[in-house]
């Protein structure tokens, strides 16, 4: 794993953009009871201000996708970024933790950004595993094909495991929730922060229970 002990002036902002009310245990756990209430789930993207620009972690989904999947957009991501003084054109790099619909939508909102993705996530999202309805349910064909178009436009950098994005910002493949799920480690003045994405949604996912939210083996412990 790439490591650094150097503190940086990186600043991390959590931008909440959507919400899903009325979730059940079946929404949060494989094998969960569809009659058991499980509360709401909030959706975020993460903006990292660096000394050289802005790195965005994930791009969320838009209002059309929210309506299709019965979610509620609280405010568009572009509006949320503007509230902290960031314009879409300020984003130099986008780290896509994985290609699920709630992490890889809004694919036309950041026209000048370079995207960062794990090799095996693109392989997973375009290969034979998508013939399985259970594995593809969280993917949207438009999001995946948009990423393919970015590859052909020379706007994607692929990583195989650990990789460096900017000073003090690295990615690390975890797997589990999706084959190429990657977390982001950010060095800040207060110390390192790990944006673990969907390695775990809830504290309950860290407990030894009989059901989980993982569909594939994990690459490492979180």
Enumerate the language-model features and the residues they cover.
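Conserved small/polar residues in nucleotide/adenosyl-binding loops
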Residues: 212-218
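Metallo-beta-lactamase
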Residues: 3, 75, 80-86, 90, ...
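Residue-level marker for buried hydrophobic side chains located in beta-strands
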Residues: 55-57, 95, 193-195
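Active-site metal-binding motif and surrounding structural segment of the metallo-beta-lactamase
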Residues: 72-117
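Core dinuclear metal-dependent hydrolase active-site scaffold
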Residues: 14, 46-49, 55, 158-189
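Zn-dependent metallo-beta-lactamase
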Residues: 1-56, 61-63
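Active-site metal-binding loops of divalent metal-dependent hydrolases
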Residues: 59-62, 99, 120-121, 176-178, ...
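Divalent metal-coordination and catalytic microenvironments
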Residues: 48, 58, 91, 98, ...
């Amino acid at each position: 794993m790439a490591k650094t002990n150097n503190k940086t002036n990186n600043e991390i902002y959590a931008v909440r953009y959507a919400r899903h009310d009325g979730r059940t245990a079946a929404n949060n756990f494989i094998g969960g009871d569809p009659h058991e209430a499980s509360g709401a789930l909030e959706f975020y993207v993460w903006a990292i201000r660096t000394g050289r620009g802005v790195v965005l972690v994930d791009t969320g989904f838009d209002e059309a996708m929210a309506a299709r999947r019965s979610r509620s957009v609280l405010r568009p991501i572009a509006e949320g970024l503007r509230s902290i003084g960031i314009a879409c054109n300020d984003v130099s790099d986008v780290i896509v933790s994985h290609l699920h619909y709630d992490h890889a939508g809004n694919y036309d909102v950041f026209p000048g950004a370079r995207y960062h993705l794990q090799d095996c996530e693109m392989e997973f999202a375009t290969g034979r595993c998508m013939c399985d309805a259970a594995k593809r349910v969280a993917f949207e064909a438009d999001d995946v094909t948009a990423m393919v178009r970015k590859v052909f436009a020379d706007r994607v950098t692929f990583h195989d495991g650990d990789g460096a994005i900017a000073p003090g910002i690295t990615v690390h493949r975890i797997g589990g929730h999706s084959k190429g799920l990657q977390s982001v480690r950010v060095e800040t003045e207060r110390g390192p922060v790990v944006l673990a994405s969907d390695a775990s949604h809830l504290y309950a996912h860290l407990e030894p229970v009989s059901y989980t939210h993982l569909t594939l083996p994990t690459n490492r412990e979180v």
